[in-house]
Regions:
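N-terminal, Lys/Arg-enriched amphipathic/low-complexity engagement segments
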Residues: 2-62, 114
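Short boundary/loop segments of OB/S1/cold-shock single-stranded nucleic-acid-binding domains
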Residues: 8-11, 77-83
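N-terminal glycine-rich anion-binding loops that anchor highly charged ligand groups
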Residues: 38-46, 63-70, 169, 174-179, ...
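Short, conserved secondary-structure segments in the cores of folded domains
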Residues: 59, 65, 82-85
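Short, well-structured beta-strand-loop connectors
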Residues: 64-77, 96
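Iron-sulfur-associated redox domains of electron-transfer enzymes in respiratory
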Residues: 82-238
Length: 238
């Protein structure tokens, strides 16, 4: 990836971006949100897990009220291409499976699993992936689907379908969007600052799935700490 970044810098020098006149350029107000490190959120007594957390059809529950479940255990299976599975965020007991009001959804309520947490946070053993290069891109795609990953944008498309369309169309350049134009949101910058190795590893896995020739991490110039962390990791691992 280091060689690809250097190659992309040479290309960028040859390209001249045209200014867009007008519009709004708000101040970056991220100082407060970046003062502390990434911390785990406290586990509440009840977790409400919608079965439709994505664009498409809802997942179908495979657990029953009263079942004791472990962290990462599959609770609802995706039954179509536009459906992703739902897993337990922590251990506990299934308290209810019922229609529940959900913010930001077109309908007033949707089917949800209510998980009463036990505070133990006991987890199942996850299937390790020591070297993603040992798997084909289709096998990696299946791992992404089984993990229940979907986009965090407004549409919430299943990540598997995004990647599948890229494979079918053919991709030369994979762009990892780490640019944050919103004045306060700082999740991308915080993630890169603290976990640059994981970001690069994830980019390499996506590149293997998409069969892309090159990969570029797009990040704004004012994200100095994040850029330095990426450079340090790439230079030390090359």
């Amino acid at each position: 990836i280091m060689n690809q970044l250097q190659h992309s810098k040479k290309i960028a020098r040859k390209l001249r971006a045209h200014r867009i006149f007008g519009g709004i350029k708000p101040l970056a107000l991220k100082t407060r949100s970046l003062r502390s490190r990434i911390m785990p959120a406290p586990i509440p007594e009840i977790l409400i897990l919608p079965l439709l957390q994505h664009q498409g059809s809802p997942a179908a529950e495979i657990v029953n009220v009263g079942d004791q479940v472990l962290k990462y255990q599959l609770l609802a299976a995706g039954e179509s291409a536009l459906s992703v599975p739902v897993h337990a965020p922590t251990s506990g007991k299934i308290a209810a499976i019922t229609d529940t009001p959900v913010p930001g959804h077109d309908e007033q309520s949707q089917r949800c699993i209510h998980l009463r947490t036990d505070g133990v946070d006991e987890a199942i053993d996850l299937l390790p992936l020591p070297d993603h290069r040992a798997l084909s891109h289709w096998q990696l795609l299946e791992r992404v689907n089984a993990a229940g990953i979907c986009g965090l944008g407004g549409a919430g498309f299943p990540t598997t379908e995004k990647l599948r369309s890229g494979i079918e169309r053919g991709i030369e350049l994979l762009i990892i969007n780490a640019a944050e134009c919103e004045p306060y949101i700082s999740a991308d910058e915080a993630l890169i600052r603290e976990r640059a190795a994981a970001v690069v590893s994830g980019a390499e896995i996506l590149q293997s799935i998409c069969l892309a020739d090159r990969c570029v991490i797009a990040i704004e110039q004012n994200k100095y700490d994040a850029v330095n962390q990426l450079r340090h990791f790439l230079e030390s691992s090359s």
